[in-house]
């Protein structure tokens, strides 16, 4: 803290510098060139409030780097503290002086806010008396050491930086200024440099080049670095006392840019520049845009298109827009994390870049001199209206150059020095004198004024301006308010200029305009004839009249010869304002109507789509309901059919197709039951026959063996029997295969029952034919056996094939019981075949016994038996 106390030493006294509080606060000052809140370290004592870039007690001291005091204010016991809790703002007010002082700071937290408030109240209570303090200025000094520590200070009045806008492009002698030469150099040598105006140069080189220009090196050579010269242009624009485009002009450009139609937007931008821009500001903006347009036209070489160039130069040209002085109609609310401020700053930067981009892309259309209508104030017209005495005075002024103008400005600068330095932190110090200097040069120099080529365009009417002056006889304003009127509302720049001419003309005609300063009342005596002239323009009263009229503090009352007031000027201004408002309202109404039409069309399309969707869904629901009802009816019918027994179903509520299927199912069930009963009976009969004939067959074999051993002739019979038995086996296999094929054929065709019965007759006839080959006698006897007789044996117990086919033909083959019926048919066919073969074998055995039995076998009683089938 010793370092802090050492830094607080001031040469004005040895009063106690007790530290009441120290800590960080946020400071914002447009006068210092800051566009946002910056955090600084503040130290509060009984006599002053100073701030540093960092905490002087903890900052490590590097070699040669000193944490100097960046600024501060002197305190006295007349100050007061005002707190705004919603934004955590802390304002220190001083009613002393002619204008008063106000300093606004911002705390990080509410706790810091109230701590600083308490400390400031204590310090102000112990501060020196305001009447005893002599020569205080109480202004936050410029932060000269923020960019470069320890660099040399420039002269108080630089030849390059800090010059008024009127002298930005031309010097007093009419020669090109530093800025104009730099612009010409960039247009000549910088168009092919990649990244020109975007790539930054060394700050020290830029400062060195400015100092060299001030020291005599006033020309730019081809071997200089274009990036350094480009940064010199930015440096000069940044150090201008006021923005090249004021706040009201930025607002006009912003409103014109928001128009959707391109042609209307260009026309509105042209009108905004012609109507709201003062002539020096318009010429400066047009010159800089011309250089930027030249660079962007070579974008294929330098890679700087209009958008890129606008991004680099927009913050320098539209400073009020980025500083938040223009209404962007955004809804960003301040928050604790400053996110809303960041969003608002980004929105402002985007709008500024977009406006400059449009001005570059349509440069030829917007800055067409034939289309620009501006208020022209020329010294030639003033000389013509003033008479020969004014001409002599103007000639005297031209001979002396701007010496008289400087002399007239100098008292204002000296007189208002303290007030200029004691302005609010949100205003630029030193701006008032420079603006007045701009005005003097603007009025006296014919080279800076271009007469409009359109003779029908609007011109300044001295009568209208005088009326406006006369109707405001009592105007109490300070230098700060006057600076705001000229700097922030350039729409009145031409009005004030015309008022200056009117004031001078009235002074020359002998009219007494006693212009008050700082709240004095105004006396307006009767006006003499305009033909009476007064040549003394160099008197102090004349100087004060000019200055007061320019700043808006002077006023007069124009009275006609009959004593009445002329209100035509006020009515004309009111009509213009109403016309402007009407046009704006029409544009807004048209915009809203277009938006409503789009929304209405979108709503109709959505309504139609929803209606179509509704109809489609209704159709789907109806179709599905019908399908569901049909499925339910079918299910009920099937359940009824399954639950009923055969032959007992009711036809009520059942369609013909379902009824036919149910009848078919009932018949199939009856057939299956009957066939099952038949199979059971056949199995029972077969078992009985096997048991009955098994013993007879064994006796027959013994008899044949006996005959073979005793009778040689029986060997032949035995051989014939064996061949017959083999033939029977072969025939059995063949019949089995035929039955299988017949069953398959019946399943596929559902017919052919008669063919099967007929096909068996040749097979039955082949049996006697095969026996004829062995013995002619046996053949003769066996040939007498009729096939019908063989087939008639045991006919009551054996169903014919045709009967079986008739039974199996009844049910449909595609019914689920068709497979069971086919199996039963095959089984029945096999049983018939076995019975027939058994009958044939029994007949053959009987014939053999009769023919070859002899006397020894007469007593033998043959008992037929079934052969042992393998």
UniProtKB/Swiss-Prot annotation:
List the cysteine pairs that form cystine. Answer: none
A Pfam family per the record:
Lzipper-MIP1
Q: Where is the composition biased (Basic and acidic residues)?
A: 777-787
Listed CDD domains: PH, RhoGAP
Among PROSITE patterns, the record links this protein to:
PH_DOMAIN, RHOGAP
InterPro entries per the record? MIP1_Leuzipper, PH-like_dom_sf, PH_domain, Rho_GAP_Regulators, Rho_GTPase_activation_prot, RhoGAP_dom
Keyword check for Coiled coil, yes or no. yes
The highest taxon in the source lineage is Eukaryota
- Keyword vocabulary terms for this entry: Coiled coil, GTPase activation
Instruction: Give the start-end ranges of region Disordered.
Output: 378-432, 446-465, 736-793
Q: SMART domains per the record?
A: PH, RhoGAP
Domain (Rho-GAP) spans 167-367
* Acidic residues composition-biased segments: 407-417
Q: Where is this site: Arginine finger?
A: 198
Q: Which residues form the PH domain?
A: 18-125
- Is-annotated flag, keyword Cell inner membrane? no
Gene3D superfamilies assigned: Pleckstrin-homology domain (PH domain)/Phosphotyrosine-binding domain (PTB), Rho GTPase activation protein
Q: Which residues form a coiled coil?
A: 569-693
What are the annotated GO cellular component locations?
Answer: chloroplast thylakoid membrane; cytoplasm; plasma membrane
Describe the task this protein carries out.
Acts as a GTPase activator for the Rac-type GTPase by converting it to an inactive GDP-bound state.
Write the protein's name.
Answer: Rho GTPase-activating protein 7
